């Protein structure tokens, strides 16, 4: 690729030197890419506010000799998601979704499913307050796109049905555990029958199912703890945006 036009969501923007900026995009065409925006901080005339996180933009890029970074020549805003930027809770959820998307995928590997999911989740945040069920649906969808979906429909260890009662969940084992396997696994997390059923509905129905899924406490807490543990197991750490959500989460249920 010498020059190309990409459509992408800004996942991160980092200042570089006195006047430049490096942006990471999740694009529809090429997956995750990073681009060098020369002079982006010195003059707003060229890029305006288009390089802010969560912005959906159209970008003209070019390859740069001897560098893994693309050159960012021009951009235009497709969606600014202005409504979500006026609310701390929505900003926190958008930041978490962007960081999770950035960490789950490798560079230059197309991820149409994750790109579309991220745009849809930002649309939902732009339209109204954050919903715990929507964030869980985003996490599950992002894990599916990355090939890391937890096993919830049967025991992750032996494959047996888990039944209709409460179960245990273990990230290292890969998901829910039946009554026969759970006692042999230390430090498992509880999942009530209603919590497991809600997660299965969100796993199958995605963001559309989240609109009719209340996921109220204690189910919301159990679902959050299980998916947070699963993500930490695969990523090797707790995301910075997740830690921020933990600070303000009691106000959001996120």
From Swiss-Prot:
Residues of the signal peptide: none
InterPro entries the record matches: ARFGAP/RecO (IPR037278), DNA_rep/recomb_RecO_N (IPR022572), NA-bd_OB-fold (IPR012340), RecO (IPR003717), RecO_C (IPR042242)
Top-rank lineage group of the source organism: Bacteria
Keywords of the record: DNA damage, DNA recombination, DNA repair
Pfam family membership, one: RecO_N
SUPFAM superfamilies per record: ArfGap/RecO-like zinc finger, Nucleic acid-binding proteins
This protein's GO CC annotations: bacterial nucleoid
Keyword DNA damage: yes
GO biological process: DNA recombination; double-strand break repair
Primary role: Involved in DNA repair and RecF pathway recombination.
Family membership noted in the UniProt record: Belongs to the RecO family.
PANTHER family in the record: DNA REPAIR PROTEIN RECO (PTHR33991:SF1)
Protein name listed in UniProt: DNA repair protein RecO
Gene: recO
